[in-house]
Amino acid sequence: MNRQVIINADDFGMSAGVNRGIIDAFNAGGITSTSLMVNMPGFPEAVQLAHQYPDLSVGLHFNLTMGRPVSDPASIPSLVKEDGTFRSGAAPQGWDWRDVHKELAAQWDRFTSTGLRPTHLDSHHLLHQDHAEIYKVMARKAYNEGVPLRRSQVAHPLSGVPAPKMTDFIMLDTYGDDKGRERLRQHLLSLRGGITEIMCHPGYEDEVLMEPSPWADIRKQELALFTSPEVANTLAAIGVSPINYRVLQRRKPSARSRARYRSKSARTRRLLPSQPYAVLQRQSREKRKRSINEKKVPFRYNK
């Protein structure tokens, strides 16, 4: 089976600096796809850039943890604080899943109102990986709209949930440390037959990203990596085809996808990402009070 890879940059639309970083990475051949946040300050500019670069695959980065909702906050009270902004961090107890449905529909509609159509669906802070109920909502939306859903590293044992198209494998890692370049190279060399998604977060620092955060350094380091010719050159040298989510849209759902998400008896198994990403997820929930632990555990494929 041919080896193909989608390199997706998250957070398109977050800010002008992130937008510029993603476009520079795309022009350098370092990424093939991105995911758009429709409720963030850089959204209008990101839409213009998406029209300007039609070969860039742009999906919806469903956001429930940052900024203000697209819906009237009063209509989704379980998702917001008193000031109308999202509750930050992981999904809290007490969310009304009807509110999640409503906000996903509102974000989808804002995206399509621009004349663009999402090529895929994923979530900010990987909420559909960590929360089975959010996965259900997003899986139904992706299936009904005929777009792929980002593969989860957690096998949610669900019955009666449609199986949208998705990649065969996914690599969730960050590359903002001294060993990031070599780690990415090893990930590329280890790609197996089928379609794998690699996630990244390139971006230039700007006013929106000035708040002290471990992500600021990660974005700058990943920007340097994914705008270098090294990624495209490595893919060419090892015979891996860079593709985007439009290619996956045209493929029939794989047996792996159907078995994984239709089986009621499937065993729930969490496959850990590399340690830097896991640490950052925990820091987000704890308001980033702890420093980054750069220890690394062996990366494992999601299968």
Where are these regions (language model features)?
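DG-centered beta-turn motif at the end of beta-strands
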Residues: 9-12
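Terminal accessory/targeting
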Residues: 1-6, 16-57, 68-116, 120, ...
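Histidine-centered divalent metal-coordination motifs
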Residues: 61, 124-126, 201
